[in-house]
Amino acid sequence: MRVRQLKPQLVTLLWLAVWMCGPAQAQQFSSDNYLSKPHGVATLILTVGERSDMFMTTFSLFPNWEFTTAAYTYHSQSRSIDEGYSTSYYVKWMLFENKAKTGGVAVKAGTGMEPGYLGAYGLEDAFQTYWMNVPITVPLFGNKVSWDLMPGASVTKDYGEDGDTAAAFTYTTRLAWYPIGPEWAVVGEVYGSEGEVESIPEYRVGLRWEPSQHAVVAVTYDDEFNGSNGGGFEIGVMLFSPPFACFHGCK
């Protein structure tokens, strides 16, 4: 997909970001932090890129819990990823948060795969994969740097020509540096998988703008370390609702 082909999608995405400017945050990163959104908040995530687009919704139905569904559409035809789509469903539980609310630990588990983790059999992997990981956030240098680590594991059923069950270790790490204050961050991450389902390691770098606790926009570039099927240029925005999705009333 050429960069110029992104223009209609970018215009739509930016219009949505402006229209809902209050509650916005960008999220095209493979890494995640420990944080669960406040109880009752619904989240809409939109990302457009050269390799794939993403539409994701998250509902914080219980305190410290998130329930997420995501859909990915693909433009690349390499690595067995024809133009098509895959889905992902998962839950996240925030286990621990420090007193300053700048770091903690969570657990995530679900099914489906995002583009950067697809192995040799492409979309066939995504619909047969179950996974778990542990997001960990560590604040450094007086909160000038935030370090996210997310080790995990996955199991893919009916993998390959023999239809065996295949396992993999997944890894993601991300650093966000705030050189001039909390509004602007330089972000970089590395992610991939090793084992019976192996993906080429990728890196992603970009800028993240955080004008308030409710608004963040990010522009990034993604590529493989030893390949040619990286995500390319991406722009993403995350839109938050006021608390409303509560079974027993929102406080």
Region locations from a protein language model:
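Short alpha-helix boundary/capping segments
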Residues: 1-2, 24-25
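Bacterial N-terminal signal peptides that target proteins for export
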Residues: 2-12
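Bacterial N-terminal signal peptides
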Residues: 11-21
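Transmembrane beta-barrel domains of Gram-negative outer membranes and organellar outer membranes
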Residues: 26-251
